[in-house]
Amino acid sequence: MEGHKAEEEVLDVLRLNVGGCIYTARRESLCRFKDSMLASMFSGRFPLKTDESGACVIDRDGRLFKYLLDYLHGEVQIPTDEQTRIALQEEADYFGIPYPYSLSDHLANEMETYSLRSNIELKKALTDFCDSYGLVCNKPTVWVLHYLNTSGASCESRIIGVYATKTDGTDAIEKQLGGRIHSKGIFKREAGNNVQYIWSYYSVAELKKMMDAFDAWEGKGVSYWRVPHELIECWTLEERPLLGSLRHMAPIRKRRLITFNEADESVNYKTGPKPVRFLGPSTSTQIKVKNSASVTVSPASAIQTSAGATANRFQSGSRRKAAQRSAPSRATALVGTGAPGHPQASPGAASAENGGTHLPPAKVLLSDKKPTPQRVIKLKRTPLCATAPCLPSPTATRQANSLKPLPGEAARALGVRTENGKNKGN
C-alpha cells in the first residue's frame, strides 16, 4: 500500500520539457484553470509526448513558460519590457491562462474572484479597498458648459467655461439665462449626470419632430442638431474625463473633518511656536521669584507687621530723646538688671517697656536658609516722672491693648519696674 501511494505521488509530480527548458510541476497546478489547454493536456484523457528522459514535451517558448508556471503556483511576475509583455500575453492566450497584463489587471481579477466567492458586490469591494488606502475611487472629470445658437443658415457653437464641479456649471447656466430660466420657453432635460437647457419659440412636440433623436439624447454633446429657420439656443453641461495619461497624477486623498478637540490633542506635524492659551485673568506665562516657592506670608501677619513698624518708628524718636537726658541712670539700670538673684526680663517684656508693641512675627518659612537667633539689647527706660509724657499714636495704642501678656510675663515686668524704682531711690 505504501509503495502504491508513493507511485501516485510520483505520477502527480511531472517533469516538463518546454523548448529545451526543464521544469517540475504538480498536475494539480497545471490543471488550475479547468478550461485551459494545460488542464486538457494533463487531465489524463490524451496521451502525452515524452522525450528520452520521460519528461513531457511542450513545443513552446521555455523562457516565457516560466512566467506562466509561476503564475499557476500563485506568484505573479510582470515583465518590465513592453515587447516581453506582449509576447507573454500571446503565450498565455495560447494556453488559455488569464495572465494579467499589468498590476491593475491582476488586482481586478482578484477582486472579481473574491466578489464571486464571498457573494459581495464588486463596487463595495472596490470601495473598501480604496478606503483602506484613504483614496477616492473615482476618475477625475471636468464639467464643460457648451453653447449652441442656430438661426436659419447660421450657427454659433462655443464653450463658455470648464468647471470642476457640476454645481459651478449649474451656477454658470443660471447666470447666462438670468430670469429666462423659469420662463415657459425654456425646456430642461437630463441624461445621466449631464443637463441641457433649450430655449426657442417651438413647443416640445415641435422640437421632437425637428430635432433628430430628441428623445434618445444620452447627454453627449449637441452634434445631432438639425433645426431650420427659427432661432434656437441651447446650453449643455457635460461631464468629460480629463485627457492624457493619469500615470503622473497624484492620488486623490479623502478629506477628513477634524474637530477642535481632535486637532488640539493630535500630534502637531508643523514646527513653530504654539498659540498662547488663555487661562483666566492671565496667560500661562509663569514668573518665578527666587525663594518664592518656600515663602508663606499670612495676610493678618502682614497687616500687623506694617502697623507695628509704624508704632516702632514713632516710639524710637521718644526713646532717643529720653536716652540723651538719662545716660548715667541707664548705666546703673543695666548693672542692677544683670545682678544675680534678680529675674531677667523677657525679650517680649523688654520691648514692651521700651515703648514699642510686641507683635507676633510674620510666618516666614525659608527652606534654603536656617533661622538665625534674634539679638536682643536690654535697655531700661527711665522712670516716667523723669521724662516728659509722650502720647502714643492711635495705632500703637490699639495694638498695645490688643496684646495681652501672660500672667507670668506681667509679674516679671512689674518686678523689674519695682526693683528699678528702688535702685532709683537708692
Curated annotation (Swiss-Prot):
UniProt cross-references to PANTHER family, sorted A to Z: BTB_POZ DOMAIN-CONTAINING PROTEIN KCTD18, POTASSIUM CHANNEL TETRAMERIZATION DOMAIN-CONTAINING
Occurrences of domain BTB (ranges): 12-80
Parts forming coiled coils: none
GO BP of this protein: protein homooligomerization
Protein name, UniProt field: BTB/POZ domain-containing protein KCTD18
UniProt superkingdom: Eukaryota
Gene name in the database record: KCTD18
Disordered as annotated region, ranges: 305-371, 389-408
Polar residues: compositionally biased ranges: 305-317
Pfam family, one: KCTD18_C
Gene Ontology molecular functions: identical protein binding
